[in-house]
Amino acid sequence: MSALCIATIAFAQTSREEIDAHPNLAISTHSVYAGALYAKPIAEAPKGYEPFYISHYGRHGSRCEANAKYSAELVKAFDFAEQKGLLTAKGKEAKALIEKIHATQEGRFGELTPAGAEQHKAIARRMYQRFKPLFKRGSIISSRSSTYTRCILSMAAFNESLKECEPLIETRLVASESDQKMIRPTGPIANEYHHNIRHNIRHDWNDILDVWAAKQDFSHATNALFTDIEPVCAHLGKSKLELISSIYKRMAFMQNLGWHDRSLIDSIFTPEERHAIYKYENYRIFCTYAGTSLKDSDRYFATMNLLVDDIVKYADLAIAGKNNASADLRFGHDYYLLGLLATANFNEIRMDYDYSDVDKLAEVWRSHQFITMASNIQFVFYRHKKSDDVLMRILHNENDVTLPIASDTAPFYKWEDVRKYLNDRAASFRK
């Protein structure tokens, strides 16, 4: 369904205004956790209801870059440019910074950084403060993780923080191959999907993005860095946008290492160029991992059904008094959290937008608001003190979100309604 003209969100700022105010967000899903920027008070529970169970899925926190090849490629590019006499004085400064960023991550690519651990500790502290009845003495907290080290250490940091809040809770941490099909997409369909991405199998959206990219002007950044960028692009086999975007992302990624001096990057890239890079990344992420409006996307989102099934299963057990854990926590990856958001299709986080216009998409779907490092979703269940009546709410990045479900108590819903909605959504992708 095309939804560009019927967006259910009314953003207070344009995407340009938002990125200008918070330039670190221009690298989209690679930005540090942005929850604090959008924090709002959550709704009070209806009278008589108390929390008794929480189900959670969180992306790992800030990490080193996933693969050495990204920064290594730029080190080689700047070496080539220097050898050919193509670097400006500013380009030489950028070369030194890129080399420093690469060297700092050497041997640690893909690993959690201290900033990432602290993000999860802070989220855990806020979870404890909001839902203290779930973390009283003797409570069991069950956590499962992707087998990637960054996810395991995110899980450990989260649980360590909960134990600091209440030392007498029992934390059970598991990172097992048996959980991986639930924690992250696996199987033939997901593997085929990721293979196509890695090997640049063309889709219709690639053509749309190419036409848009050809109209973008990066002359300030290119002239600031190089006396002539064309030989560097030819040497790497990349377009001008691909090279300039990669340079920006590598330099801006330093926020995940705890470095926050933007003076060099902001002297190279104009606000217009920064915003164009953001729109490029935003569009690519929507079309790669989030948009349910894309052709054949249902085949990929069908791989999320095991996570939906797991959430439903353990919630049902908790309601029936057969789940001895008061919290089921899961630690995984950005693309699976995006898949869960696509399945839920919250009123505030629609995933069914038209993708025919790169600029317009950035005004209705903004990746940095949905999926940064440590982004998370929390399903919180409440029971009435004097009955067995159960309501639940959903928090995305610690803020209330709503569903297209009738409720007199929104953002609180009857679990049976949410259960049916999630199962129906998941089933629609299974077909």
Can you describe what each PLM-predicted range is?
Residues 1-15:
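Bacterial Sec-dependent N-terminal signal peptides
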